[in-house]
């Protein structure tokens, strides 16, 4: 897990290069590489070009630098970056620098053709549903893959079907995986848990023990995400563990 501040030390491109090279050296199969993109439009577009030059396939776009912008301005920003690189949307919780984004934003964002996925990480049930509702309203649920970033609700986000209305029709979608700081530690166990969850979903039968795992994982997360101090030490917590 890195930090936004790597840019201040001139480490953005070196970190991307190291991560891409390491993935190529260690993996026997092709790995999808997603770079973090931040800042206002000029910076985000420049970072997209750096990511492409390093062999990245997509960019996950933080909107934290766009605080106070209208939905129209946010969409214009996203469209500009999407013209350079396939985009992964990122709903970051306001407690750590994100901004509140209504369902209307997510509908318009999902309508951008070069959007391929969204990381949903507002740590809020209502806002999580706003993303799902927006994607469904745009008719983009088959094109856009949803990932949970809600470290406080990992297991149930992956287990539960999300059913929302589009007109008179009910559309059911699922969150397919996770982009989680939590999974930066004990990664093999995280992979095994995800495989177990997928198997349960495919079988149509979810055991109570798997449902109970949600609260256990959340309790564990509270320790190294420094919940008691408003997430102030969440990145050092992941690094320490």
Question: For each of these PLM feature ranges, what is it?
Answer:
Residues 1-106:
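Active-site beta->alpha loop and helix N-cap motifs at the rims of alpha/beta catalytic domains
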Residues 80-88, 93-234:
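Catalytic alpha/beta core domains of metabolic enzymes, predominantly
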